[in-house]
Swiss-Prot record:
This is Ribonuclease T. Residues 1-11 have a biased composition (Acidic residues). Transmembrane segments: none annotated. Mg(2+) 1 binds at residue 34. GO terms for cellular component: cytosol. It comes from Pseudomonas fluorescens (strain ATCC BAA-477 / NRRL B-23932 / Pf-5). Keywords: Exonuclease, Hydrolase, Magnesium, Metal-binding, Nuclease, tRNA processing. The gene is rnt.
């Protein structure tokens, strides 16, 4: 299915002059998302953490990470959680300071913030940015389906994958190595936290987009 089917869904746009962010990404607002999970199967495995960073644009057309939303999430009823996944992420479900919320609470708050950013940037819909973005989008869509949420601001299948973009820009597809190549500080001890990975992915995405602009690409944002 072509994403043209979704072009008329005006989630956050309004009349008046077109905002440069909307012009840059064809009406879509990039929002970086990372999830930490109980496994690889979005239908059966728990969503344990989710973070989302909205992207802003300055008066010169350069993009930057704007605001991050982060939640530790209670596993949905009947969710599968692989021991290997917990070992990999370091998540301790019984930690007294974990303070997890329901999937509904997490997504409702994130979607509210995303809609606010859509309105501020004159964009019609959010497009997920992620490192290996199909994984994050799959878990997001699965949670939306479980909750029967009717107003999901994200495009259901299009995304920007920073693993692909970093492979093009830096010859690296691993997040830590791509960040190092882009002169972005990356602490491996903090990795696999949804907040940390989201914010580093946002820095990487903005760096690649801005580097392309500096090299002469996308100078005319009204095209």
């Amino acid at each position: 299915m072509s994403d043209d089917h979704f072009d008329d869904e005006q989630e956050g746009s309004s009349g008046g002059p077109r905002h440069p962010m909307a012009a840059r990404f064809r009406g879509y607002l990039p929002v970086v998302v990372d999830v930490e999970t109980g496994g690889f199967n979005s239908a059966t495995d728990a969503l344990l953490e989710i973070a989302a960073t909205t992207i802003g644009m300055d008066e010169k057309g350069f993009v930057f990470p704007e605001h991050t939303y982060f939640f530790r999430v209670e596993p949905f009823e009947g969710a599968n959680i692989e021991a290997a996944a917990l070992e990999f992420t370091g998540i301790k479900l019984d930690h007294p300071l974990r303070m997890a919320v329901s999937e509904e609470t997490a997504l409702t708050d994130i979607f509210r913030g995303v809609r606010k950013a859509l309105k501020a940037n004159g964009c019609k819909r959010a497009i997920l940015v992620g490192h290996n973005s199909s994984f994050d989008l799959g878990f997001l869509n699965a949670a939306v389906a479980r909750l029967d949420m009717k107003r999901n601001p994200f495009h259901p299948f299009s995304s920007f994958d920073t693993a692909t973009l970093a492979g093009l820009a830096y010859g690296q597809t691993v997040l830590a190595k791509a960040c190092q190549s882009a002169d972005i500080d990356f602490d491996g001890r903090e990795a696999h936290s949804a907040r940390y990975d989201t914010e580093k992915t946002a820095e990487l995405f903005c760096g690649i987009v801005n580097r392309w602009k500096q090299m002469g690409g996308w100078q005319d944002f009204d095209d």
